[in-house]
Structure formats: structure tokens, C-alpha cells
Amino acid sequence: MNLVLPDVSLAPMLPVLLVLVGAIVSTLGGFWLPRRTLTALNILFVLASGASLVWLWGGAPWAAGMDVPRSAFAGALRADPAALLLGGTVLLGALLTLLVSLDTAYRARVSFAEFDALLMYAVTGCLLIAFSGDLIVMLIGLEIMSLASYVLATLQDSRRSQEAGLKYFLLGSVGSAILIYGLAFLYGATGTLNYAGIAQQVSALDPQNIGILVTGTLLVLSGFGVKIALVPFHQWTPDVYSGAPTLVSLFLSTVVKVAAFAGMLRVFGGALAAGPGWHSVLQILVALTLVIGNAAALYQQNFKRLLAYSAVAHTGFLAMTLLGDTAQGGAALGYYLLVYTLMTVGALAVVAALQRTEEGLTINDMRGLYYRHPAYAVALAFCLASLAGLPPFAGFFAKYLAIQVAFQAGYLLISVLAVLSSVAALVYYLRPAMLMFMPDRTPAREYAHGQRPATNVAVALSLIGIVVLGLLPNLWYGWVASPEIWRLLAGT
């Protein structure tokens, strides 16, 4: 009898392994390495992981002629184009977060050793989700990401941070339990955990198993709904984003959200693309998310809570892309996630740079910002305009693509609602933007002092990204719109 060994090629795992090594180095060396050295090392690990993505894509000069394997462990891990694209967005968000942390973590009273280690573990989980080829790997990545994120939310020694972390843990745990329960139903209906196997079974499913499949699908949708803050599973978002350190809020609203949508795209855009029932339910949830997210944001005075409800509204736009064709929807989602990461990092990096404590800036605190920090005021105004979807910024084209996907898929009411919600968003985005350029002889708040070179680099990169991708959207969309990127989404 011949012993058949599983495929254990490490090449598809290289981006994940490099970040994991960074996490281990932070864990072991965080208590004796200087704080800037530790963060600089993690930045190098993230850049190395990004370089490995380029190598796996085949775009690196040293990779010419090399036969690079695309999967490992019998397809459980897949380095397909969609994984590389979404993984690159995850790494970009992590890189910008680390840059901002160099200048602002000490003010937030956050331990560099703990912050860097937990962040790198969370990024490891995020990459596992993007590279997953079956439900087990996706679930492992999701739990690694979630557990590290729960602790990150509590890192600051304050009651608000502890409360935020507890709420995030409780509601996130419920979401994970629902998701696991749903995955069990999917396995019961299809008899496989592999995305490609599930897609094949769904297309030729025994009628007796349709009820089990629909139940599992709706449970999985609900579990992911908690992770991405889809209404009515969004209740944790404003409290966690406003109570956690701004650095952590930045990470949760970008990297974690990108990874969660990568998982949703794998499951609903690949394995369950032909599954029954979930499109109608997701349509209703998207409508609720657009309405409630924008309506709640109109009444916020705390700037981070405003951005939290804004994130809920953007979740609605991001989820709209899942309603359409996998190739078109995947391209729109890939573009939107990159743009959303840049916009959100830019806005929250400015907040992190300005605030002296973690009590949070109010909208009135923005009055007269231009006369004290003109560069930050202009950068924040550009980010808010892009979040609102105003041309010529990249946020306009991102929202346009999401609406186009829904419209061409036949969801006319959702498309109209998305347009109306974009108009409503102008009110709460432009209010702080206008206050920043109004003179104020008696400022309500004293901003933080000192040089913030790393944060300035992160803000500048974000600003350049949203302007260039707005003026020349095909620089990114023309690439991600290739059907070949999304053809292998289910692992087929």
C-alpha cells in the first residue's frame, strides 16, 4: 500500500507565515525591544508579506519562469488572484495602522508590545480568511482575528475601553456561535467543507436537503452580519468604535471589515452563489442598513460615533455588491474595499493625531481647525468628501460601482435607496467639514502638540490614494475588473 502525503507546499502560505512570524517576534521580544524598533520590525514583516503576494501573483522579476503552486493542504489554502487582491488590501490597512501607532499609541496609553503582537495575530487571521479554500480554514482565521480584536478593544486602561471590549466580545461571540451553527447545517446539507465541493453540491442538491441548506445559509449570513455590522446586527459598532482607542477603531473599521467581506465573498460569491433564499434576505438587510446607518449618523455629536454609523452605512453599499454577478460584484467590492480603507484611515488618523486623550472629539471641536492645523483640516475635509461620495474623489466611483451592480442585477428599489442615502450622507459629512473652516476665537478644545511624521505619511498616502483613484479609477478598477480574478472564487 502506497502512502499518499498531502500537499504541504508552503509557497501559498508565505504571506500568512511572514505576518505570523512578526506576531511571534512581537510576543517574545516586545518586552525588551525599543517600541519604535518593534513597530518598525512589524512594518518590515508586513512589507515582506506584501512582496510575497507580488511573487505569488507572478509580477516579481525574480519569479520569472518559476512554477509557483496556488494551493496547499488539498485546497484548504488557496493563493488565487482574489485572495492576493483582498490580502493586499488587508496588508495595506495593517501597514497604515502601524504607521499611525508610531506617533499616537503612547498618548492612548496603549502598550506597544501588546498592541503590535495582537494586531499581527489579527492580521494573520484576516489573511487566513482571504486565502481560505474551505469553511474550516475560514472559521479558524475568523476566530483568530476576532479573539485578537476583542483584546485590542480593551487595551486602554479606562472604563470606556473595557466596556467597549466587553460589548464587542459578547456580541462577537454570539455572531461566531451563529456562524458555526450555520456552517454545521451547510455541511449537513452538502456533505463537504470545501468551497468548490459546496458549489457543486448546491447546483445539484437533493430536494430533501433544501430546507437544511436554506437554514444554514441564513444562519451564516446572520453570523457574518455581526462581523461586518449589518443591520440589525450592528448594535456593537458605535459603542466599540467610540470606546476603543482610536488606533483600534481604525484597525477594526478597515482591516477587520475587509477580512469579513473577504469571507462573505468566498462563501456567498463562490460556494453559495447559486444557493436559494439569501439574495432576498440580504436585499432587506441592505435596505435597513442604508436607512438606519445614515439616519443615526445625522444625530451624532461625537465624531467617532458619527464615523461608526457612517461605517454601518458603508456596509450597506459594500453588501450591495454581493447581490450581483460574482465577477462584476467582486470587482466592485475589491475596488470599494481599497477605497474605503484609504478614506477611513485618513479620517481616523487625523483624529488620532489631534486628540490629546481618548475622550473623543465632538463635531463642535472641529470648529476653526483650519486656522490651527490647516494641513489636517484639508486632509480630513477630502476624506469626508470622499466618504460622502462626492466627485472627483474615489468614494464617488466606489458608490457608483456598488449601485451599478445592484441595478444591473434587477434590484431597482435598492439602487434608488442607495442614491437617496448618499444624498442624506452629505448632511452629516459636510457639517464637520464646514465647521473646520469657520473661524473660532475661543476654541473648545486644545489639540495635541508635537511632531507626527509617521502619521503624516499615513494621511498623505491615504489622501493621494483617494484623489488618484478618483481621477483615474481605472488604475485600480481596470485591473480588478478582470473576470479571471474572480473565476476561481469557489476554488473550482
Swiss-Prot record:
Keyword Cell membrane: yes
Pfam entry (one): Proton_antipo_M
GO CC term (a single one): plasma membrane
Chief place of localization: membrane
Catalytic function, reaction form: a quinone + NADH + 5 H(+)(in) = a quinol + NAD(+) + 4 H(+)(out)
InterPro entries found in the cross-reference section: NADH-Q_OxRdtase_suN/2, ND/Mrp_TM
Subcellular location: Cell membrane
A GO MF term: NADH dehydrogenase (ubiquinone) activity
Enzyme class label: translocase
Keyword list, A-Z: Cell membrane, Membrane, NAD, Quinone, Translocase, Transmembrane, Transmembrane helix, Transport
TM helices/strands, residue ranges: 13-33, 43-63, 82-102, 110-132, 136-155, 169-189, 210-230, 245-265, 272-292, 306-326, 331-351, 377-397, 410-430, 457-477
GO biological process, alphabetically ordered: ATP synthesis coupled electron transport
Bilayer disposition of the protein: Multi-pass membrane protein
Superkingdom of origin: Bacteria
E.C. designation(s): 7.1.1.-
Entry-linked HAMAP family: NDH1_NuoN_1
Record's function text: NDH-1 shuttles electrons from NADH, via FMN and iron-sulfur (Fe-S) centers, to quinones in the respiratory chain. The immediate electron acceptor for the enzyme in this species is believed to be a menaquinone. Couples the redox reaction to proton translocation (for every two electrons transferred, four hydrogen ions are translocated across the cytoplasmic membrane), and thus conserves the redox energy in a proton gradient.
Subunit structure: NDH-1 is composed of 15 different subunits. Subunits NuoA, H, J, K, L, M, N constitute the membrane sector of the complex.
Membership in a protein family: Belongs to the complex I subunit 2 family.
The name this protein goes by in its record: NADH-quinone oxidoreductase subunit N
